[in-house]
């Protein structure tokens, strides 16, 4: 009994203990839940404040991107040019090149202008004397009984032909009425005159391109050895073709001068302004095209010829105007501003054109000294013993400047403007002629000295002693062409020297040489040694169309410059 009671009390105590433990568990669970709830409330509160702080930071960042801060950043922003040093150095060199272009270009222009002046004065001074000497030889040679030699040398034959062409064309020009042409052109509208002037410029370039070919064909036909097979139409047809060409070209230049005279005498000067604006259109047609060194040389030669021709046209216009005003010196000052304006516009257009062409094509200003040396080489080589052409013809081939039509027009204008009456007038004419001869001789001496200096600076002396090349389709000429390219012994040039080669007269060649077509001696000059090796590999029996393309400055002639359009 006692055991059962004790067991029952023990069970009750266990149940009580279990209940107490449950209550403790429940109470501890409630406390945990309260703690968790309190902790969650604290976390939500902290998140709210954090979000609030982030919003405040965002508001402060937005306030930092204000207009004042942007302007401040733009004003204080820095950069470093030395990070692209090569680019900026190149740009600076381009600026320096553009600044050097006017000086170097005008050096070339002045040198080329005096070359054209030398050729132009030759027609008035030395050519009549050479023709007179040739005629004296022609008349006195049969009396001397020299039957085995030529009656006239080839150079004398060419001089006589030039003289006859000038005389015939001069008498033909008397049938052209300058006054009627002036009033006919003056009655046209401004637009018509502008179109006419542009057409005349194009026609002048075409005449210059084809005219020298006609004259060269006449000279070669008249001096070709008689033993050759007849492959031409004869000297007389060639002579009449040359006379017709010089006459038509002279009329063309007369129309140009008349149009310019009408522009000078217009009341509002609108035509003169339009004609001057035509020069600036030339910038558009030339600047934005690809140019190489040879193309720029062609354009430079064309600009020299154009400038000399324009100056001569201005002289003709001034003579005609002074004649109309009875040689009143006050009227000369009326023409002076217009003349200066035309000259200034011509110089400005040339400078701007060449400056931007060299800039866009990465050509240095030193290239103009090479062009000047090439022109000087022609002058020096024409004074050698083995010279194959007269210098006037060389300038005509190089620049496209043919002096005969322009000289013929100037003679026509001067003889119609100046009346020679009495012995005093004849004395004045003789003194003026002696003055022109003096000017021609002094100009030739100075040009020859300068040319020798330029050739020496360019290291082109050795090219002066090389024989002129030749080319012909036959095998004989091909063999002769190969022998021409062989180098001469080094002792021969040393014995003669440059000074002797430019002062002695050409020696007489055999009357029956191998069939050859004379070409420019300057074709021998090469700017790079690689070109000489390439040129030696060309087949000698190839025709003109199979020749290698021209790469050298001395090979550039008027065949490609008269159009003045380089694609």
Swiss-Prot record:
Chain segments carrying region Disordered: 1-23, 465-543
Matches recorded under InterPro entries: Tatp1
Topology relative to the membrane: Multi-pass membrane protein
Gene Ontology BP term (one): cartilage development
Recorded GO CC terms: centrosome; ciliary basal body; endoplasmic reticulum membrane
Basic and acidic residues bias spans: 534-543
Function: Plays a role in primary cilia formation. Involved in cartilage and bone development. May play a role in the differentiation of cranial neural crest cells. May act as a downstream effector of hoxc8 during development.
Similarity comment: Belongs to the TAPT1 family.
PANTHER family: TRANSMEMBRANE ANTERIOR POSTERIOR TRANSFORMATION PROTEIN 1 HOMOLOG
Pfam families registered for this protein in UniProt: DUF747
Composition bias, Low complexity: 468-477
Compositional bias ranges of the Polar residues kind: 500-510, 517-529
Protein's name in the database: Transmembrane anterior posterior transformation protein 1 homolog
TM region(s), chain numbering: 108-128, 165-185, 233-253, 332-352, 400-420, 426-446
Cellular compartment(s): Cytoplasm, Cytoskeleton, Microtubule organizing center, Centrosome; Cytoplasm, Cytoskeleton, Cilium basal body; Membrane
Keywords on record: Cell projection, Chondrogenesis, Cilium, Cilium biogenesis/degradation, Cytoplasm, Cytoskeleton, Developmental protein, Differentiation, Membrane, Osteogenesis, Transmembrane, Transmembrane helix
């Amino acid at each position: 009994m006692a055991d059962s009671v004790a067991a029952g009390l023990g069970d009750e105590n266990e149940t009580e203990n279990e209940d107490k433990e449950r209550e403790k568990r429940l109470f501890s669970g409630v406390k945990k839940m309260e703690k968790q709830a309190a902790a969650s409330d604290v976390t939500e509160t902290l998140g709210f404040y954090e979000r609030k702080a982030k919003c405040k930071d965002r508001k402060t960042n937005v306030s930092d991107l204000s207009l004042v801060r942007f302007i401040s950043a733009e004003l204080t922003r820095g950069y470093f040019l030395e990070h692209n040093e090569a680019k900026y150095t190149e740009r600076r060199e381009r600026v320096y090149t553009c600044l050097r272009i006017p000086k170097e270009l005008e050096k070339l222009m002045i040198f080329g202008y005096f070359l054209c002046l030398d050729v132009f004065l030759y027609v008035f001074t030395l050519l009549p004397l050479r023709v007179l000497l040739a005629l004296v030889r022609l008349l006195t040679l049969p009396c001397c009984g020299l039957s085995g030699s030529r009656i006239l040398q080839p150079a004398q034959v060419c001089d006589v032909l030039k003289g006859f062409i000038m005389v015939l064309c001069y008498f033909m020009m008397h049938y052209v009425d300058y006054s009627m042409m002036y009033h006919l052109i003056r009655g046209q509208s401004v637009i018509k005159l502008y179109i006419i002037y542009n057409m005349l410029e194009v026609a002048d370039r075409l005449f210059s391109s084809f005219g020298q070919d006609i004259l060269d064909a006449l000279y070669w036909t008249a001096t070709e050895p008689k033993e050759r097979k007849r492959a031409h139409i004869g000297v007389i047809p060639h002579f009449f073709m040359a006379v017709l060409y010089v006459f038509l070209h002279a009329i063309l230049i007369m129309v140009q001068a008349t149009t310019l005279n009408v522009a000078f005498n217009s009341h509002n000067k609108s035509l003169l302004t339009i004609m001057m604006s035509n020069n600036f259109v030339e910038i558009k047609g030339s600047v934005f095209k690809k140019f190489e060194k040879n193309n720029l040389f062609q354009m430079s030669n064309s600009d020299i010829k154009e400038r000399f021709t324009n100056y001569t046209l201005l002289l003709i216009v001034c003579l005609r105007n002074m004649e109309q005003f009875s040689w009143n010196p006050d009227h000369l000052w009326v023409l002076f501003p217009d003349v200066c304006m035309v000259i200034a516009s011509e110089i400005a257009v040339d400078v701007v054109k060449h400056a931007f062409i060299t800039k866009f094509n990465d050509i240095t200003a030193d290239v103009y000294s090479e062009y000047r040396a090439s022109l000087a080489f022609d002058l020096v080589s024409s004074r050698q013993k083995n010279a194959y052409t007269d210098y006037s013809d060389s300038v005509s081939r190089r620049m496209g400047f043919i002096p005969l039509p322009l000289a013929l027009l100037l003679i026509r204008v001067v003889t119609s403007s100046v009346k020679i009456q009495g012995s005093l007038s004849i004395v004045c004419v003789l003194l003026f002629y002696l003055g022109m001869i003096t000017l021609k001789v002094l100009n030739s001496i100075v040009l020859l000295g300068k040319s020798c200096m330029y050739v020496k600076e360019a290291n082109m002396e050795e090219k002066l002693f090389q024989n002129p090349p030749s080319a012909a389709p036959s095998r004989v000429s091909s063999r002769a062409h190969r022998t021409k390219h062989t180098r001469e012994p080094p002792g021969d040039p040393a014995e003669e020297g440059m000074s002797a080669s430019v002062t002695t007269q050409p020696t007489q060649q055999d009357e029956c040489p191998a069939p050859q077509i004379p070409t420019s001696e300057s074709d021998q000059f090469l700017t790079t040694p690689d070109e000489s090796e390439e040129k030696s590999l060309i087949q000698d029996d190839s025709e003109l169309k199979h020749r290698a393309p021209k790469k050298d400055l001395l090979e550039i002639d008027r065949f490609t410059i008269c159009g003045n359009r380089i694609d």
